[in-house]
A protein has these predicted regions:
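Feature of Fe-S/electron-transfer and energy-metabolism proteins
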Residues: 1-235
Length: 235
């Protein structure tokens, strides 16, 4: 709110777009702000820092060095965040959109290829094709057992073929103290969870689903509700 207010105060409302995202990964350095197109990464930003960033960077084009993540500062300017020690060896899959898109905007998810996998599944593949693809991928559960996901789906589809109703249950609860993997996905990219559940439902023959998420994660709950509403509106 402080950033939006300061931007409007300086007459930049039509020139600068503020996009909220999920956690970008360096949680200990939050709150963070990334200014594009150059990708300047400001860390541990306080409300009182906002006027300086807007005036110096957005108006005058001068980076506020004291607030920049120091590893990105070089003699030749600002290097990409992806080249820093924390990120350069990462290959994001489930978290690829977190910190990049606005989790409350379905169009941004679609713009990054969202729901294309579901479209392909529904138009080009049978449920057995989907299950075989998951089996071939070697995808396994994140729990201690590491049970093959494709085998779970195969069992769910075949054991009770004539069931009146099947459900997809998404366990978004963090069982380990201090773990925030599920929370990061739900807060940063909720549509990817809905798309995955829809694909799983098609594969096993389920038409309804439940998501179990902690009440202690109000932002995750709020963004899930927004995502569900948007997905329904888009059909």
């Amino acid at each position: 709110k402080a950033l939006v207010s300061e931007i409007e105060k300086n007459g930049l409302k039509e020139e600068v777009q503020v996009v909220k995202t999920g956690c970008f990964g360096l949680c200990a350095l939050g709150p963070i702000m990334i200014v594009y197109p150059e990708g300047t990464f400001y860390s541990m930003v306080k409300v009182e820092d906002i006027p300086e960033i807007v005036e110096e960077h957005l108006l005058k084009g001068r980076i506020v060095t004291r607030l920049v993540y120091q590893e990105t500062v070089t003699d030749n300017g600002i290097k990409s965040l992806q080249d820093t020690a924390f990120y350069k060896k990462q290959h994001r899959v489930a978290l690829r959109n977190c910190g990049v898109i606005n989790p409350e905007n379905i169009d941004e998810y679609i713009g990054e290829g969202g729901y294309q996998a579901l479209a392909k599944v529904l138009t080009e593949m049978t449920p057995d094709d989907v299950i075989q693809t998951i089996l071939d991928s070697g995808l396994r559960g994140r729990g201690g057992g590491g049970f093959p996901t494709g085998m779970k789906w195969k069992l769910a589809r075949n054991i009770v073929k004539d069931a009146d109703q099947k459900y997809v249950c998404c366990n978004a609860d963090e069982g380990d103290p201090g773990a925030f993997m599920d929370r990061s996905v739900l807060e940063g990219d909720p549509h990817v969870v809905l798309e995955a559940m829809a694909i799983a439902g098609y594969a096993i023959g389920a038409t309804q689903g439940y998501i179990y998420v902690r009440a202690e994660y109000p932002i995750a709950v709020e963004r899930l509700e927004i995502a569900i509403k948007q997905a329904r509106e888009y059909g």
